[in-house]
Amino acid sequence: MPAANSMAMKRETLNLRIKPAERDLIDRAAKARGKNRTDFVLEAARAAAEEALIEQRIIMADPEAYQEFLVRLDQTPSPNAALRKTMQTPAPWEQEK
């Protein structure tokens, strides 16, 4: 079983060309977070990658379904208690602290 675990934990190598000043900045930030350079860079890159992919969510629809979607977006919503509450609640940036 140790062989299977070691295979699952194996990491690939990623080489980067970086200016010394940038490397020093990353090292200082990693130290401030109590991490080594590799873990700090990997964590930051992974977070940025996940954010980029979340922002790029794509919904696929055939032309008829997309047209129906647009029609529904243009329709005036029926009044209801939840909508009234939402419209009467100040936005977070409008609320007094």
Swiss-Prot record:
GO terms for molecular function: DNA binding. Disruption phenotype: Deleting the operon causes 90% reduction in persister cell formation in mouse bone marrow-derived macrophages. All 3 tacA-tacT operons can be deleted without an effect on growth in cell culture. The keyword Transcription regulation applies. Coiled coil: none annotated. Residues 58-97 are annotated as: Neutralization domain. Induction: The tacA2-tacT2 operon is up-regulated about 15-fold in a relA-spoT-dependent manner within 30 minutes of phagocytosis by mouse bone marrow-derived macrophages. SUPFAM superfamilies: Ribbon-helix-helix. Keywords: DNA-binding, Repressor, Toxin-antitoxin system, Transcription, Transcription regulation. The keyword Ribonucleoprotein does not apply. One of its GO terms (biological process) is regulation of DNA-templated transcription. Homodimer. Forms a complex with cognate toxin TacT2. Forms a 4:2 antitoxin:toxin complex with cognate toxin TacT2. The neutralization domain (ND) is sufficient to counteract the toxic effect of its cognate toxin, although other regions also play a role. Exchanging the C-terminus (probably the last 17 residue) for those in TacA1 (probably 15 residues) allows the chimera to neutralize TacT1. Belongs to the TacA antitoxin family. Antitoxin component of a type II toxin-antitoxin (TA) system. Counteracts the toxic effect of cognate toxin TacT2, but not TacT1 or TacT3. Plays a role in persister cell formation. The TacA2-TacT2 complex both represses and derepresses expression of its own operon. PANTHER family: COPG FAMILY HELIX-TURN-HELIX PROTEIN-RELATED-RELATED (PTHR35401), CYTOPLASMIC PROTEIN (PTHR35401:SF1). This is Antitoxin TacA2. It comes from Salmonella typhimurium (strain 14028s / SGSC 2262). The gene is tacA2.
